[in-house]
Structure formats: structure tokens, C-alpha cells
Design a protein with these regions (language model features):
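Bacterial Sec-dependent N-terminal signal peptides
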Residues: 1-26
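C-terminal edge beta-strand
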Residues: 26-31, 132-133, 140-162
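Extracellular ectodomain surface segments
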Residues: 31-71
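Short structured motifs
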Residues: 39-43, 99-104, 116
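Generic structural detector for well-ordered beta-strands
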Residues: 46, 56-60, 116-120, 130, ...
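Surface-exposed or secretory-pathway low-complexity segments enriched in glycine-proline
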Residues: 62-106
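Aromatic sugar-binding surface patches on proteins
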Residues: 108-116
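A short beta-strand micro-motif common to beta-rich folds, especially ectodomain repeats
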Residues: 115-139
Length: 163
């Protein structure tokens, strides 16, 4: 019975993780004028509990380690990045799903992308959404890195028009 419960819990968690990545097709990349080799993450749009959310988050991935070095001096500058993969996204507000425009980027061809969030938020909070990426840098083994961004979900508003 214990094995069944563990299997059920594991299946439930996996299903929910996969479910969070579906149903939000059609994000639109909308970036300001930027340098070609840079790191950029657009600001998020606030949501409200109980109100349908439909938002895009545009980004630009780096082509080399130069912009990474500018933010993290421990990363050596001057190395080409041959591939970047979005591995996971955690702490997405309950009720929201997400879907990226793509999960694997070849910086020689494509560094711009977006993630679409949609659904009806169930909980109010400022969510620190974590993103895990894996980068293949020149001849080095693949490197995993993570970063966070905030998404604010406001409490539901109520009106008292009838009293």
C-alpha cells in the first residue's frame, strides 16, 4: 500500500508539472531595441486572484559569456555559447499554466523567446518564479544556472454595489 501511495504521489506531481507547461500557446516576443549579445528579461504584468491572466514574458539569451560575466564576474568572459536549454520553471502561481516559445536555443541563430502564462490565479502573493537553464559553453561541460523573477498576483477585489 505504501508503494502505491508513493507511486500515486509521484504520478500526481509529474502530471501537475507537465500540466503547467501546456495550454498557453501563442506567446509573442516583444523586445525593446537591445544589443545583439545581451541578457534581458521583460517585466511581468500583475494579475488578480479570480481574474483570467494572459501574459507574455519576452527575453533575450546571450550569445557569449560576456554579458554573463558583467553580472557574475566569476564567469569567464569571451566564450561562445553553443546551446541554451530551459530546463524547468518553479513556483508558478497556482492556477496558472505556462508555455515557452521554445525550450532549446542555438545562439548563432536565435536568442529571442517568450513564455506565455495563462489561467486564473488562485492565490495572492508576490511569486519568485525560478527558471533553470543549461548552457553549453565552448568546450566546457554543460553548465546549469538559475535565476528568478517576480510575478505579483493581487487579492481579489470585491464590490458592494447592492447595499
Amino acid at each position: 500500500m505504501k508503494q502505491f501511495n508513493i507511486l500515486f504521489l509521484f504520478s500526481f506531481l509529474i502530471f501537475n508539472q507537465l500540466n503547467a507547461q501546456t495550454g498557453c500557446a501563442g506567446c509573442v516576443v516583444d523586445l525593446p531595441t537591445l544589443p545583439e549579445d545581451t541578457i534581458y528579461l521583460a517585466p511581468t504584468i500583475n494579475g488578480e486572484v479570480g481574474v483570467y491572466y494572459d501574459g507574455n514574458l519576452s527575453f533575450r539569451m546571450p550569445k557569449t559569456t560576456d554579458p554573463v560575466n558583467a553580472n557574475d564576474p566569476g564567469t569567464p568572459a569571451g566564450l561562445n555559447i553553443s546551446e541554451i536549454k530551459i530546463i524547468s520553471m518553479v513556483n508558478v502561481p497556482p492556477g496558472l499554466s505556462w508555455e515557452p516559445s521554445q525550450t532549446t536555443f542555438d545562439p548563432d541563430d536565435q536568442t529571442d523567446g517568450c513564455v506565455k502564462f495563462c489561467g486564473t490565479p488562485l492565490v495572492s502573493d508576490t511569486f519568485e518564479i525560478g527558471v533553470v537553464v543549461e548552457a553549453q559553453v565552448s568546450i566546457l561541460p554543460a553548465q546549469t544556472a538559475s535565476f528568478t523573477f517576480q510575478l505579483y498576483i493581487a487579492p481579489a477585489t470585491s464590490s458592494n454595489d447592492g447595499f
